């Protein structure tokens, strides 16, 4: 089942990639600092990420960890 979170995070990751950045690095920076500057404004990604549940986002990024 596709959730609202799944839809939003996909849109955010696509915007980050389209802006020329690597999604994991940017999302990791955002969750570790809380600074929204890590998220591009492209396609409203910065506003969209603010609507996501913080714990759900943190779990998602932890699962993405390439290490």
Task: List each language-model region with its residue ranges.
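Intrinsically disordered, low-complexity, basic-enriched segments
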Residues: 1-67
